[in-house]
Structures are given as C-alpha cells and as structure tokens.
Amino acid sequence: LSLHDALPISYLVKSDPSLPSVLQNLWDHTLRHANLMIVICGSAMSFIEKELLGEKSPLYGRATGILKMLPMPYWDAAQFFPNYSSEDKALAYAILGGIPRYLEEFDPDETIDANVKRHILRRIAPLYSEVEFLLHEELRETAKYNSVIRAIALGATSLNEIATHTMMANATVSSYLANLMELGIVEREFPVTAKPKERAKGSRGLYQLSDNFFRFWYSFVFPYRSELERGDVEGVYERHIKPVLHDFAGKPFEGLCREWMWRESAAGRLPFRARAVGRWWDRQDEIDVMAVDNASDAAIVGECKFRNAPVDRSVLNLLRDRAARTGIGQRTYLLFSLGGFDQSLVDDAAASQSDVQLVGIDELFHE
C-alpha cells in the first residue's frame, strides 16, 4: 500500500507537467503487475478529478476505484464531544458540520463559547483561514465566489435572488453555482415530492450551502473580518454571534432531524421504509422534514424547533394544516424539540392510535 497526499502531488505536477505521463508509463509497464495499491487522497478535489484522473490526463481510466468521502453523520460527529450536553453537541454540529478535520479543532473540555472564540475567531486559529485556503486551492476569482456564497449564507436561495444580491448577471451566477456544486460547497434542493421531470427542469430548486462550517464562516467571520483582524474576538462573539447562535442553528438542526429519520427508517423504526427524506414547500407553506413512501400514499411530516421553550399544540395544528396541502392522504406527524413539549402534546402522543410522535433532543443523540 502506497498512500499519497494529493496536495504535494499537485505542486509537483505544476512544476513538472510531464509527471502524469511518467506515472502512466510506470503504471502500465511495471506497477500494475505488482502487488501494490496506490492511494491518492486529499481535499484538492478539482486537481484529483480533472488534472490527475480527467479525460485529458495520461492517467485517465487507470483508477480502479474512486471514493468521495462524505461528512460524518451527526451521531458520529457527537463522539468528538463525549462530555457535551445534547444541546451543545447539536450546536457544535451546526457550527462545524461533519468534517473530522474541523471537529478535532474544538477542545471537548472547553465550552462552545470558548471554542468558537479560540479556534475560529482568532487570527492564528487554523479554522479562521480554512475557508479562504480551500477556495484559493480550488477556484479563481475568489472575490466573486465569496459574494455568491455569502448571498446564500444570508438566505438568498433562488438564482434571481443570488444574482440580485451579488449584482451579477444570472448567467454568470449560474456558472459560479455550477462550480460550487461540483466542489460540494453548494447543493440544489428540491421538494421531497418533486418528480424527476421537475428536478430536470430545475424551476423549483433552491440553492443552499451543503457545509455547515462554510455557512457559519460566511455568516459570522467573513462580515466581521475587520474587527477580528484588530483582535476584537470577544466583541464580535458577544455582539454578533452569541445572541443569534440558536437561531443560526435552527437550519442545521433541521438537517440533523432529517439524518435521524434516515437512520430510523434504515433500522425499521418508522411506519414505513422511506424512499426519500427532505423538505417540502410550495408557494405558501413549508415543511421542515418529510419522508415519503415508495409503495403507498403515505408520508411522515415533521416540524423542528431548536429553542429553549416547550413546543405546544399550536405547532402541531399548524403542521397538520400545512401537511394537508401536500396531497398525501396517510400522514404521521413528528415534532422535534430542544425545549421539550407541553403536557397536552405529551398526552396526545401517548394516546392509543396516536398519529403523533415527539422526539426530544436527548433522543436524537441516543444510540
């Protein structure tokens, strides 16, 4: 087994463009017949996929396997913080996502507040410059890409909204978005009930950042760089981050709940095995999480509340009203809550033949 980091190889190829041809000749005539496995790994995705293994590369077609590593699910990410409460585990995941490189930067014996200030906001912290490093490694015109990513982080989700926010032409923004999606920084989301033809047309698709840390960085580091460069870490955190951190974590919490539904479905603990799990929306309403069945007219619809207050019956009633607009007849309801549930909901869920299930924050992290 011969293991190599892609980044040094990329520098070698830039200094000597003939290197892939040399490797091709060596592989074709000698190494392919040896008891040897060569593994090239790293975050320089565009270099590996295009320059090293792409159609125009001498090494094209030589790879016997390509594995794109995905972020860890939240329950594995939580193992980095064994002493954290379930709430703090969810906050850490909302900030860092599931990339081990980011998760290991936080000290599990420090609070969320201390970790953010020490390991993200300080100029000497590796995570402070991580996003810029990745963009410079993969892209040109980073200033324009910064504008596009920042627009999405602030809530612009359609092509027109992003173009308006960045003051760029739609065609230009579309090109940048395509590159960001190829790198796994941005993803396009469709209602979970959308048919393949709808997805192909793309008219209802919404853009969002697929990486939690990118979303945090563009929400709280990028806009306050001048203060952070002057060393005002405490001020930036207390004024701009701490008061809204739970609101910021609301969207990642929805993603966490969707991951939970996938896990429960795979384990056979839902009313049916889900064909798809995602969000649902139309022009008027939105449902945070929804699982649909492949074989019947059934769905599980859910609402996610990351706030320190009990969820009451009004949330369930509103969810029922929204779910009626989906056109799916057989529905089960899930309520996810950081702050628990009021007694009327607990009684309702405990009743026989209830179509309501309550999932508290500790249950989400229960193995």
Predicted features, each with a name:
Residues 1-234:
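Phosphate-binding site recognition
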Residues 205-367:
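A cross-kingdom feature that marks ATP-driven nucleic-acid transaction machinery
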